[in-house]
């Protein structure tokens, strides 16, 4: 079971400190600034780490594949997956289809 704390980390040291404090899942933020190469760099000396990237993650095949191939455990998405206009219009069909599409890209990338 994962602990509730998920600190934002941007370096090997920060991930290490978070793990020493008992965190099982560390959030890499902002993902779009730090990039997938950072994840590979973090996992090289700490392959046991479970990393979740957030911030600028897009529900596109290219973006999700790059994060999964880099080695993230999971991704977090907000406004890119749940656009304000679609939520305001209660267009749950759009949101549902976008979620299914994103999950499909993730499943394919994990093969």
Predicted regions and their residues:
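C-terminal helical cap(s) of enzyme catalytic domains, especially alpha/beta-barrels
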Residues: 68, 84-111
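Short, small-residue-biased leader/transition segments that mark boundaries at the very start
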Residues: 1-2
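Hydrophobic faces of well-ordered beta-strands that scaffold small-molecule active sites
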Residues: 5-8, 26-28, 50-55, 75-77
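Alpha-helical structural signal in soluble globular domains
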Residues: 21, 41, 45-46, 70, ...
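Glycine-rich phosphate-binding active-site loops on the catalytic face of alpha/beta enzymes
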Residues: 28-35, 71-91
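Glycine/Thr-rich beta-alpha phosphate-binding loop at enzyme active sites
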Residues: 11, 17-38, 86
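Mobile acidic interaction elements
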Residues: 40, 45-48, 60, 64, ...
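Catalytic cores of alpha/beta
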Residues: 13-21, 38, 58-75
């Amino acid at each position: 079971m994962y602990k509730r704390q998920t600190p934002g980390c941007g370096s090997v040291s920060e991930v290490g400190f978070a793990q020493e404090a008992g965190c099982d899942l560390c959030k890499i933020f902002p993902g779009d600034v730090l990039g997938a190469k950072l994840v590979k760099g973090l996992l090289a000396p700490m392959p046991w780490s479970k990393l979740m990237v957030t911030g600028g993650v897009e529900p596109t095949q290219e973006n999700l594949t790059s994060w999964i191939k880099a080695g993230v455990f999971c991704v977090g998405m907000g406004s890119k997956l749940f656009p304000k206009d679609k939520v305001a219009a209660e267009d749950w069909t759009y949101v549902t289809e976008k979620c299914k599409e994103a999950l499909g890209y993730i499943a394919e990338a994990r093969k």
